[in-house]
Amino acid sequence: MHVATQRRNNILNNTLTNALTIDVEDYFQVSAFAPLIARDSWPSRPCRIEANIERILLLLETRQIHATFFTLGWIAERYPAMLRRIAAAGHEIASHGHGHLRVWEQDAGAFRDDVVLSKTILEQLSGQAVAGYRAPSFSIGAANLWAFDVLLEAGYRYSSSIYPIRHDHYGMPEAPRFAWRPRGAGGLLELPISTVRLGRRNIPAGGGGYFRLLPYALSRQLLRRINAHDGQAGIFYFHPWELDPGQPRPPGLPLKTRFRHYLNLGRMQARLERLTADFAWDRMDRIFLKADYA
């Protein structure tokens, strides 16, 4: 069956549109690499972001999908033409912070400077108003909910920064699984990455390394459950480096880090092609910044 026809049929059978999101950072900026890759070495590292973004844009154009690109200010400053190309293709530009500092590594003042700087850079270069923010490594949790006050003051309208799971580097498993306002009515809207509730645990269902680890059929079933059982739009994310099995491999990485980062990179493109054909997708702002959410 022709891909476009298949996708139309799939959409007819799935009334909900899900949010497709990309965290725009390069391979050497991953938080798990921080102990081995000094921040001041970033400018001298071979960047692969442009080629990987082009691959993503081609896939989205083929599928006629618009997505949200949570972009580092650091990347935007160095690749302004790439950022403009993303925006010109009709995608939402959102912030991933400036220098990929985890929120818990900063106090309120430093965090404010980071999110204001990234928002300013992204808006100036893209010509779009930036409404959304995603914390590097989902680094907002119970101990630093003050970050939502800072984001609201800085002019953001929503965040996608809390992952309601248990993980050794991040997570707030007690948090709501769907849209909520951590600071109460009038506070910033938080849109968590998708999970499925099984027993007493939330099972990751929204991308990242779990999407590369789990069989595709299971990932598809989890997302379908969110749409059909929970009646909610799913939120899925991935990184450009996940489509790049040929990326440089820094020496000295711990075994667990190597497993998590490099697992099934060579299969990611094909899985994304299936995922984008099996579900309807759109930008975060178009799905969630509507009267029933905002």
Where do the model's predicted regions map?
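Active-site beta->alpha N-cap acidic-glycine motif
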Residues: 12-92
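Conserved, mostly hydrophobic/aromatic
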Residues: 23, 60, 96, 118, ...
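The substrate-binding groove and active-site-proximal loops of carbohydrate-active enzymes
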Residues: 39-47, 70-72, 99-111, 136-139, ...
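C-terminal domain-boundary segment and adjacent tail
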Residues: 62, 158, 214-294
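Metal-dependent polysaccharide deacetylase catalytic core of the NodB/CE4 family, i.e.
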Residues: 63-144, 156, 161-168, 186, ...
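Active-site-adjacent pocket scaffolds in enzyme catalytic domains
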Residues: 128-131, 135-237
